[in-house]
């Protein structure tokens, strides 16, 4: 029998299919399956392209399944699939493009590039900073992702979707392409692409079938990976919300501590190297003294970026959480614009637009200027950034959270955005807690303050008003039963004569008058201004208001009703005698005099600093100008009472303007604001000298409300300090009253606060009063009256008064210095004599001639 050839055996088996199947199952099936399952690699020759038998293809499939079972890394599994596909499709190269959404825009980025049958994973894995990114409207892969259909490009030169920029970048020529989307349900997850069919002009229909068949493995791998990733993200998000929620409800009082506790607690779940939180200033409206320089043209208006609700973007604090290397937290109050977390401009941009920004390659970013060098000694550099706004329930941006460098080196993806956004959104909503607490605390403080006011102050009652409006004695009825003409007749007989009492003079002294007489003088000023009839002020309300004001001032050493009246009297004198009334309307004059009378009502005899140190409810209620705002609120509280409201017959516009003028006037008495406004006032005075006629200047002044407000604010300061301008016999007494009140505060600081007071408030340094007075006159007071005397020469008597008083205080200060110098010289003489006597005593140690004095602690026998 001759030798049987392979062709004959193959022909026999093809003709006897049943026999071939029985023979294979009996002899080889168990061994093949056993060998296949036990093998570490498929027994297929990949060294050159060739057609595969069904057994070899089965081995490839089993190899892919085993790899999928044993390998948890999605990139490696997909890489193995692509290597096999390269061989099966006889493609020169394959690449994988991952679908993602960045800043709301879909795109494709290379994850595995230039995979071939002999490739190594590490060479094909694309680093985040080396990605090639395709938008969906560009290239064949973009078209595939957009259409969600397989694409077989026979000739790239004739295809409208082909883009050659990758060929130009890699110096490679793409002739034909076979690409298909990898789907998860209806969503595109990635696009896989094979290029350049080997030994054939293009990919065939058979290649499309092979690709789709083996793509099931890629689909399965990506789906499992995607579901695993989603599960991980949702788990992290749940943990973040759970832990941040626990810390949010632990801290209900302060937004900064609330954010800090929540963000620090969830740091392990954020999957980044570093993150920072910038807190925004929530101030929407500036104080008038900050607006004046802009309105006066002395400072340019703010032209920088603003939040969507119109606030100036000002990060008042940045909290930096460092998670790489040694963990650390840095809190930067009032960070400079060049701080590393702000210098790029990204947080400002996010605060301005309210958008989430995902920067995947920070060093290559053109729009934002990130630092390209290491930030610290550890060599840490910014690679990718995710920044988003923190928005409260009112849709106001309260801060910006920025996360740097995902830990696995990849850029932040859509799920990271969702996770971080959940945290930022939760923190934004949680701001409602400290806001509500602050509102409740504010109401509680108001309640405490008003309870204290009610205990101490009582408005003018029906018995007290009879001391001035003697309606029972004259008409036998109550004031509210009388006509206005009847009340006017009574007041005409009761109120003092303005000329006789000199209430319009700068040298007026309250010392000879009783407090009731001062109330009557105050009422008379309203008649002198001719505002009672013009604005239909009820005369009963006027009397009750002035009497209540006198009771509203506490019985303290200096800041009592007498001081309040003196400030009102000086305001009246400046308007009438100083001729400043020409710049103001009658309504404004009414508001200014009323504000002057109210300016220190319910003063406690201690200053603003003491309120803060003692943690007085006032300090918690008012952030700045603490006492001044309290005086203002107290005065407005009296005016809200119908029986005391002298503004009750003003129309709405007049009432709002009068209250506005009072707001500015009373707050302007805070000396802390004095140095802000005096330069502006000086420029107004200088400008007044450039006008030829008084009428032209007056018309110019009345055109601009801001100029009038600045003058009024400086008038309030001049009124508040006016005691320093009184005749010496009056001023010297008042100065002692001021000093006595200061010393009382110093005593409180010693006993209550356990602190040493400043020299001005130290009773033990009372002898230095003349020197302190001279310093106060030079540093604070002289400027006011010198400028007012330049502004209006009618006010010169006030400057003369302060000049004379300075001479008196200077003489006393010099006398004190002379006495102290004499005492010091006498003391030195006594010490010298005592040392000389000690040197002559037996056992003493006299110093040699011209030598040092003998030691006080050592004696040689």
Curated annotation (Swiss-Prot):
N-acetylglycine PTM positions: 2
Compositionally biased intervals (Low complexity): 830-861
GO CC term, one of those recorded: photoreceptor outer segment membrane
Region (Disordered): 821-861
Subcellular location field: Cell membrane; Cell projection, Cilium, Photoreceptor outer segment
Residue span(s) of domain PDEase: 483-816
Residues bound to a divalent metal cation 1: 563, 599-600, 720
EC number(s) per entry: 3.1.4.35
Residues at the active site: 559
Residues modified as Cysteine methyl ester: 858
Propeptide intervals in chain numbering: 859-861
Domain GAF positions: 73-222, 254-431
Major site of localization recorded for this protein: membrane
Cofactor(s) recorded in Swiss-Prot or TrEMBL: a divalent metal cation
Molecular-function GO term, any one: 3',5'-cyclic-AMP phosphodiesterase activity
Any one biological process term the GO annotation gives: cAMP-mediated signaling
Lipidation (S-farnesyl cysteine): 858
PROSITE patterns in the record: PDEASE_I_1, PDEASE_I_2
Residues annotated as binding a divalent metal cation 2: 600
Membrane topology term: Lipid-anchor
UniProt keyword terms in alphabetical order: Acetylation, Cell membrane, Cell projection, cGMP, Hydrolase, Lipoprotein, Membrane, Metal-binding, Methylation, Prenylation, Repeat, Sensory transduction, Vision
Major enzyme class: hydrolase
Functional summary from the UniProt entry: Rod-specific cGMP phosphodiesterase that catalyzes the hydrolysis of 3',5'-cyclic GMP. This protein participates in processes of transmission and amplification of the visual signal.
Subunit and interaction comment: Oligomer composed of two catalytic chains (alpha and beta), an inhibitory chain (gamma) and the delta chain.
Family: Belongs to the cyclic nucleotide phosphodiesterase family.
Protein name according to UniProt: Rod cGMP-specific 3',5'-cyclic phosphodiesterase subunit alpha
Source organism phylogeny: Eukaryota, Metazoa, Chordata, Craniata, Vertebrata
